[in-house]
Amino acid sequence: MIDWLVIWGVTQGVGFVFKPILEDLAKDAAKDYIKDFFKTSLGNVIKDLINKEPLQKAIGKAIKEFLELVQQELEDEDLDENQLKKYILPFKKLLKNESVRQTLGSAFDSNTKLVNINIVADIAKEVVPTLPPDFNWSRVAKRYGKKVQAIRMNSDELRKILDSENLDKLVNQNYEIRPEFDLEKYQESIQEQYGNLKLEKI
């Protein structure tokens, strides 16, 4: 059984107040998020993908980064732990919104330089209690974009899925994402290791 919280790096975060949100997300391995999160970059191809695990890994990591940035903004306003905990349920509700998921997921699109955080901010006004006056959504968006690009760059599997040239192959059940195999290097290593064997004596 996959421990999604470990994969997403949640267990490493000391003092991470939004951990309960990720614990709920881990119950269905973020499957409920996939369609909305990657709608911009993958569209209808998602339903045909056989191996969705790289997407599940990326979603959890991205949401963790987003919530950590939100917590950082709140802590900069000198909110104590009890005050921070009041934001858990509202932000959990915020992340259930389809438009919010699509906006956060759009950061995985290579053509997206900066997510349209105004969409998230406007919806947050309806579901999140009054945020501190200096809470900066633009700063969250900028930092979040960099975090997501790092997630993308650090996952070969994810990059191959998001590469549009691979989509047709990935929907084929006979195709699996595999590490690149260097045939020439393999041949050289075989020759070095066994080149001196005198096979005629065997």
Residue spans of the language-model regions?
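Structure-specific endonuclease nuclease cores
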Residues: M1-I202
